[in-house]
């Protein structure tokens, strides 16, 4: 299973729509 950090990195390297989800995830983390 992926760690949160690995998932975070992968999402940021993916094209949309994953990018949109990553943005949401980022905002929650900040």
Swiss-Prot record:
Region annotation Disordered: where it falls in the sequence: 1-21
Reaction it catalyzes: an [RNA] containing cytidine + H2O = an [RNA]-3'-cytidine-3'-phosphate + a 5'-hydroxy-ribonucleotide-3'-[RNA]; an [RNA] containing uridine + H2O = an [RNA]-3'-uridine-3'-phosphate + a 5'-hydroxy-ribonucleotide-3'-[RNA]
Record-annotated active site: 12 (proton acceptor)
This protein's record includes keyword Nuclease: yes
A single Gene Ontology CC term: extracellular region
GO molecular function, one term: ribonuclease A activity
Compositionally biased residues, Basic and acidic residues: 1-13
Location in or out of the cell: Secreted
Family recorded in the similarity comment: Belongs to the pancreatic ribonuclease family.
UniProt protein name: Ribonuclease pancreatic
Lineage, uppermost ranks: Eukaryota, Metazoa, Chordata, Craniata, Vertebrata
